[in-house]
Amino acid sequence: MSVTIIDVAKKANVSKSTVSLVINNVPTVKEETRQRVLEVIEELGYVPNFNARGLTTQKTQSLGVLFTSQTNTTESNFDFNCETEIYPNDILAGIPDALVNTDYGLIIERYSVDNGPDQPLPKMIAQRRVDGVIVIFGLYSEELERRIADTGIPAVAVGGAPVLQDYVSADFQQSVYIATEKLISVGLKKICYVNCPPFFSSNQLRRIGFYRAINDHHLCVEDQRVIDTQWNTGKGGYEAIKELLMSGYMPDGIVTAHDGIALGIIRYLHENGIRIPNDVSIISIENSVLAGYATPALSSVDVNKRELGRKAGEILLQRIAQPTMPKVAMMSTPTVINRDSVKQGE
């Protein structure tokens, strides 16, 4: 007779659910208990039958990753989008770190939010192909959050603070605060913050972080500027700084919502003979792979994207195993990565 999960539980003196948590490598199990269960599994030669388990438990052993974005309607040949391309892929790179030694795989789906509240749910959710889903927040609306919650499929959001679901996020307000503070610390007094478009949920938090730094360091608010880009892209940054400079305002420092916007700004400044950091310093939020390849190399605030992905995976596994556990909400701690785009202090 084959060994069952009940046999393992009895031998290890734990519940069946604890054995299941160990098998799925859920990190909430005490290490002493985990080792005892693993030793019993090896001793008894227990092999989980995931196909049979899927039929009886309705589990797929798959997790979903949902990228929320808009259909690209611009025509620029450098229309890279940090929020819907590089940013989520860096988060995605961390999710498998949480799945090591589990039997879960990933299904990835891009979901356009352009079609309004009546559009179908993402296929992986509507067809119940996954046991849980990680949503890269971006354009994640309250309506979509509610519709996913109504399906009963566990979800963890990355990059925002939904009402109904667990989430992990960069601390957008603090990220912009310390970026602005960095420019102030080297003696800059006319600072422009180039924000993401206003339809992004983090727009207002980022704006608050900027003005909090300005006020805390007693800079004249009237000398500062905040611009919301039309596009969350390199083109958005290019057009925003072009409009600002043509208005006659010349900042000595620029903070941007993410590296993609910063690269568009850098391109415009280069084209118009404005030197970085001699004439204007620039710092961004994100610290993507793009930052080190900019000319000059872009100072940027690291928001720990890979770690956000790993934590999202861990939390989702916990939620699947323990549906009634308290809501989890966590934010990463940002740090400034100094490169060459900010001048030295006076």
Q: What are these language model-derived features?
A:
Residues 47-119, 211:
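Amphipathic helical "hinge" segments at domain boundaries
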Residues 66, 134-136, 255:
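Structural motif
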Residues 52, 122, 145, 180, ...:
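Short hydrophobic/charged patches on amphipathic alpha-helices used for structural packing
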Residues 3, 10, 42-44, 91-104, ...:
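Bacterial carbohydrate/catabolite-sensing allosteric modules
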Residues 118-174:
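Short beta-strand-centered segments that line the small-molecule binding cleft or hinge
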Residues 15, 61, 131, 189-190, ...:
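Short acidic/polar active-site loop segments enriched in Thr and Asp
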Residues 1-62, 343-346:
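N-terminal helix-turn-helix DNA-binding module of bacterial transcription factors
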Residues 43-49, 114-117, 138, 238, ...:
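Short gly/ser/thr-rich secondary-structure transition/capping motifs
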